[in-house]
Amino acid sequence: MKILILGAGQVGSTLARYLCLDDDNDITIVDQKEEMLTPLQRHLDIKTVNGYGAYPSVLEKAGIKSMDVVIAVMNSDERNMVACRMAHTLYDVKKKIARIRTTEYLLRPEIFTNDALPIDFLITPENLITEYIRGIVEEPGASQVFDFENGLVQLVETRAFVGTPIVNRPIKELQEHMPDVKMRIVSLYRNERAIPAKSDTVIREGDQVYFLAKKNHISRALKEFRRAENDYHKIFIAGGGSIGLNVAQLLEDSHNIRIIELGEERAKYLSEKLNNTIVLQGNASDEDLLKDEGIENTDLFLALTDSDEVNVIVSILAKRLGAHKTIALVKRDVYASLAEQSGDVDIIVSPDQITVSGILSHLRKGDCMKVHSLQHGKSEAIEIVVHGDEKTSEVIGEQIKDLPLPEGVVVGAVVRDNELLMGSKKLVIESGDHILMVLMDVRKIHEVEALFLENEQ
C-alpha cells in the first residue's frame, strides 16, 4: 500500500515506524522542518519530502498521484483539512484520513463531506485517549483495556501476581475456577518474549497476560491474576487541558474528582465547565498543596498535562506521598523509560500509540471494525466482520480449528447477533460473525486479511 503521511511530529513519526514493520507498505512523509525528517530517513526505509504539506507542488513532489491513502497529522486542523481537500479535488485520492482536534469543527459533521471537506475518516486523539483512560478507571487491576463490538467484549492486559489462583497453574484450570465466566487468554509475554497461550501453558509470576472477556466478567477474571483491588473513588487529575477536562467530565458524576491546573484563566474556565469537580489553581508539584488536598487518601492520580517531564515527576511525587495508584500520559520513549524505572508510575499511557491504533483500523483490508496496537506495534488485536457464503468465503462453514491461520494468530472470540461466543476449536464460522483475533506478529496481517476477504464469484 502506498501511504503519504503529512506531518512528521510525534504521531506522524510514530505512525511511520509502525507502518514500516510491514514490508508491503511504501511510505512517504512530508514536513516543513528538515530536522524532523532526518532521523526518520536515517532509521526507516521511507521517502521524506521537506515542504508545506498542503501545497500542490509539495504533494506532487511526494508522489501523491500514485498514493492509495493520505494521512494528514500536521499540527494544525486547518492545514489537515486543506491537504485532504487538495488530495481529493486535484488528485482523486480514494482514502483521506485527518487528525482533527478542534471541538468547533467536530460539532459540525456536515462539513466533512465530499462537497465541503472531503475527509473519509476523522481521528480525534483527545477523545480516543479519554475513552482509553475510562477503560482503565473502570477496571482496577487492568493495565490496558480495549473495546470490541461496542464494548460488549474487551481485551484486557494485566500482570500475574504470586499468591493468586492461576499463578504456577496451567491455563486450562481457569475454566475450572470460573465455569460461569466468559473469558480466554489470547496472548502471553514473559520477560518481553511471546509465550504460546496453550491450554497446558503454566502462568508464572510477572507474566504479562492479555485476555478477552465479556465486559461484566472482567473484574471476576482479574482476581485470578492479582489481588482484588477496590474501585477507584477519589481521583486526582493533574492538568486541565482538553484531556484532563474530558476525563473529569466523564467521571465526575460517579467519582470524587479533584483537578489541579496551573493557569489562572484555564482554572476559571474549568470551574465553569465542571459541575461536580473541585478545581484547584496551582502547581501539581506543590507538595504542600497535594498534602492539604489529601493525596495520601487518593485512589488514583492521573498526570495529564502537556509535558512528559511534569507528568513523570508529579506521578512519582504523588506515589511517594501516598497515592494508591498513578497513571502518567507520556509521549517520548526516554520519559516512558524513566517512569518505568522509577517504580512509582503504575501505568504509562502513550497518546501516540492510541492515536495510531485509531488510524490503523482504516488501513486494513476487508471489513475491519477495530485495530488495537500491542507491544509497541509488534502485535495487534483486530475485529473483522465475515461476509459472503460458503462459495465466496474461505472461512464460512469452517470450524475454527480448520482455519489455515498463520502461526501466532489466535481467534479469541466471535460475536454473533450481539452474543459473545468464546473461540472454541469446534465453533463454526457464519456470515456476519465478528471475529476477534490477536496477531503475535503484525507482519502476518496480510495473510489474515486475504483469508477473511470475500472472494468475487
Q: Over which residues does each language-model region extend?
A:
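Cytosolic regulatory regions of ion transport systems
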Residues: 1-457
